[in-house]
Amino acid sequence: GAGIEPVARALVAAGCNTFFVALPEEGVRIRQVAPGAVIYLLDGFVPGSAEALIEFDLRPVLGSPAEVAEWAAADRRDHPTSCAIHVDTGMNRLGLTMAEARALAAARGTLAALSPALLISHLACADTPAHPLNRRQLEAFRAVRDLFPGVPASLANSAGIFLGPEYHFDLARPGIALYGAVFAEG
C-alpha cells in the first residue's frame, strides 16, 4: 500500500483530524504521526483490551452488547476516552440491532458511562445508487439518531458520499475513495 504514516501525514496536512482504522496497531501508528487526531477502531476491540485503547486514546466502535458492557465498565477516569456506537440499519453484518440500540438509549446510566462521541452505521448498497436499501437505511438511521440526541452521526462511507448530502450527517467516512475509487454507474 501507500503506507499508513505517509497517508496519515498527508491527510492531517489537508485538514483531516478524524481517522477510522481496523486494528489497534494501525491506530497506534497514526497516533505517532498525528498526536491530536481522533482515531476510531471500526472493528471494536478484543475483550480485555480496553486498557490499551485508553492508553493511546483510541476510540472503539462498539457493535455488540458485550462490547458496550465492557467499555462502560472500563476505568477511564484518568483518560476520558470516548467511543462510537455502531447500529445495524440494514447491512445485517455489524452493529447493534435496532432493538439493542433502543435498549441502550433507554439505559441512561450505561449511556452516560460510555460517553459516545459518534453514532454510525454502514450503507450496504451505496455503490448502487438506485438500490431501495439505501433509502431504507437512511430512514432507519434517522430514527436511531433520534434515540441519541446530541451525539454526532455518520452514515456515508465512500460510495455513500455520492448519494447526496442527506446521507452525510455530521461526518462522512471516505475510505477507498481517497485512493481514486469511482462510484458511478455507466
How would you label these PLM feature ranges?
Residues 1-14, 68-82, 87-186:
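Active-site loop/helix belt of alpha/beta enzymes
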Residues 1-58, 62-71:
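N-terminal active-site wall of soluble small-molecule enzyme domains
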